[in-house]
Amino acid sequence: MSRATPASDSYTNSNLFSSTYLDEHVDSIDAWDCDEEAKRVFEELRALWRAEGDLVRSHNEDELLSAWIDEVCEALGFDSLSETTLPGGYGYNDHLLFDSPERRREAVREKRAGREEGAYGLASALLEAKQWDADFTERFADDRSYRDASHQVKYYLERTPDDLGWGILTGGRTW
């Protein structure tokens, strides 16, 4: 299957990767050839949006997690584990995301054995959810070890094993 080379105006480069890499090399990566899977997932997400779209703004954080965010993560191929204590007992995050049910089950075993660090080390990402359209930079009113939602995810990642390199902050619309 031939692959189209992306045009620089089809994306916003935040300089995580060079434009040359994105324009000339990324399309040669086998994993990048995922158009059919992407279309299938997009249609699944579109159907979910048709079912939930008029409700999401009224959901509190837990409802949004259950009715929207969890469903989006599942459609994207993630399995999840809820409210896992950070290693060292520095709080807990909303979800750990795993690339397979087997890795999630292995993480549950680690968690039950009191090895939170092992559970976090098996995760693909941690996820912190807020209400729909939450301002991630708005200062929290109460005294916490982190000042806002963006800093909260950074704080969590700093207290997890190096194997876990990704944190996702979402209010359902912005990820």
Regions of interest found by a model, annotated:
Residues 163-175:
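Hydrophobic or amphipathic alpha-helical targeting/insertion segments
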Residues 1-166:
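A short, conserved, highly charged catalytic patch centered on acidic carboxylates
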